[in-house]
Amino acid sequence: MEKELTFYSAGLKLAGTLYLPGNLQPGDERPTVLCCHGLRANRKVILPEFARAFAKQGYVAFVFDYRGFGDSEGTKWRLISKERDEDIINATTFLGLQPEVDADRIVLFGISYGGANVISAGATDPRTKAVASIVGFGDGDRWARNSRRLWEYWALRKRIEKDRERRVLTGSSEYVDAYEILIPTPAEEKFYSGSGQIASLKSELPLETAEDIMSYKPEAVVHQIAPRPLLLIGAELDYLTGFEECVSLYEKAREPKQLHILPGISHYETYSQGFDTVMRLSLNLFGQALGAR
């Protein structure tokens, strides 16, 4: 069963979908997985398959659109990382008010950029009982630098500086094609074309977002998740964020922590070929953190 819901974050109405297990009985309160989407995605891309799989295992799962994305209110396609963290924290509060949710057993599950967001939000919010970060990153500037040739990186830096001047003079940021910030890979085009979801991902992003991404460093706070358990999953052939980002996060995190690099697959194949492994590892983590359902 699925329920469409809305809640507010910073005065903006955000849209979400609640996935309920089939064996839910009146009065039941279940452990809940809050699922967080990637950079330019929305709640209808990739995550519904994971949410339904969690529900089949007896969990409640919730997927929502960050402000400015999907069906949520906010400046369209404007991504500010700390605002996304705030949306996650407010979603946690909202979930705790739902009759089907055990407010004391909420965990975070994030993919790609959402994998970075769940680390910083989980580190900030002690209500989070466990964090699963899938093909995320720890340092936005390092990611931006490593995904470009050096001259391209510095050219982007120069554009960002000019845009900062523009914003203080005009109050607006220049919007550019998302692929000028998020360098595309052949694996991405193949995955989304095959899934039929490519149209829903067409977007432009403000250069303000590029500046924000490059200043975002979840690895600076990842140690604060402990003593709650952390799961980091990377992909050996991840040419988008690079599995080294997961390794760096792992090195800076404290126990209890797990790191798994899935062999022979790309960033996007983590959601298809790697799906069963991601689910198995995540369910093991959540089961240990939350106890029997």
Q: Which residues make up each language-model segment?
A:
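N-terminal cap/lid segment of alpha/beta-hydrolase-fold proteins
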Residues: 1-28
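The serine-hydrolase catalytic nucleophile loop
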Residues: 39-52, 66
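Catalytic nucleophile-loop/oxyanion-hole region of alpha/beta-hydrolase
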Residues: 42-46, 69-107, 271-274, 278
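Conserved alpha/beta-hydrolase
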Residues: 53-71
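Alpha/beta-hydrolase-fold enzymes
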Residues: 117-195
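Short beta-strand/loop motif that positions the catalytic acidic residue
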Residues: 225-226, 232-234
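Conserved alpha/beta-hydrolase "acid-adjacent" motif
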Residues: 239-245
